[in-house]
Amino acid sequence: MTMDKSELVQKAKLAEQAERYDDMAAAMKAVTEQGHELSNEERNLLSVAYKNVVGARRSSWRVISSIEQKTERNEKKQQMGKEYREKIEAELQDICNDVLELLDKYLIPNATQPESKVFYLKMKGDYFRYLSEVASGDNKQTTVSNSQQAYQEAFEISKKEMQPTHPIRLGLALNFSVFYYEILNSPEKACSLAKTAFDEAIAELDTLNEESYKDSTLIMQLLRDNLTLWTSENQGDEGDAGEGEN
């Protein structure tokens, strides 16, 4: 029995409440594949679902990679760690490729509003960034370059079409700056991007409407936290490398 759009959306909401994010992602993938432009609510459900699905694998990958490094003297343990890490990597890559296919095939081509276009291009940058975290060699170069390209395109549209206080524009600046810091190892560029976004938003705080006030100020706080952390790390202090992301 094929479910219609409203039933799939309802299923996604139920799955979210039950914290069954794989089910939530499957439901929202089916909604997307129907080929209509998503509403803001549907867009957010899709984003939350995949963010949790991929987030669980990114977190597992970091834990196993760290354990793998600590077992260098024990070949058997290290081999087991390596195999398990590769299993998680394969899952993570499948998820990212799923999202990237939805973006290229449906979401980006169907986006009529600049806000949606920026949202989806940011998402494209994010999922190529997640791929680049686990990639190596030529594959890494390709994913890094694709990520930067998507972020850059989103960034240019956002500067032209959106207020500096818009939560999507701020979220993009946050993640693009994390990309510069973590993936390109360019702390100066990361700090400059984050600081500019923060300062421009502060200067226009009075343009914030009530519904996005909470979202915007939360992201501004994350931008400021990252700036504080990155500045202290570059001055040689041992900082906690837990960058905030949107």
From Swiss-Prot:
Keywords: Acetylation, Cytoplasm, Host-virus interaction, Isopeptide bond, Membrane, Nitration, Phosphoprotein, Ubl conjugation, Vacuole. One of its GO terms (cellular component) is transcription repressor complex. The modification Phosphothreonine is found at residue 2. The modification N6-acetyllysine is found at residues 5, 51, 70, 117. Homodimer. Interacts with SAMSN1 and PRKCE. Interacts with AKAP13. Interacts with SSH1 and TORC2/CRTC2. Interacts with ABL1; the interaction results in cytoplasmic location of ABL1 and inhibition of cABL-mediated apoptosis. Interacts with ROR2 (dimer); the interaction results in phosphorylation of YWHAB on tyrosine residues. Interacts with GAB2. Interacts with YAP1 (phosphorylated form). Interacts with the phosphorylated (by AKT1) form of SRPK2. Interacts with PKA-phosphorylated AANAT. Interacts with MYO1C. Interacts with SIRT2. Interacts with the 'Thr-369' phosphorylated form of DAPK2. (Microbial infection) Interacts with herpes simplex virus 1 protein UL46. The lineage of its organism: Eukaryota, Metazoa, Chordata, Craniata, Vertebrata. It is found in: Cytoplasm; Melanosome; Vacuole membrane. The record marks 58, 129 as: Interaction with phosphoserine on interacting protein. This is 14-3-3 protein beta/alpha. The alpha, brain-specific form differs from the beta form in being phosphorylated. Phosphorylated on Ser-60 by protein kinase C delta type catalytic subunit in a sphingosine-dependent fashion. Its main location: cytoplasm. The keyword Cell wall biogenesis/degradation does not apply.
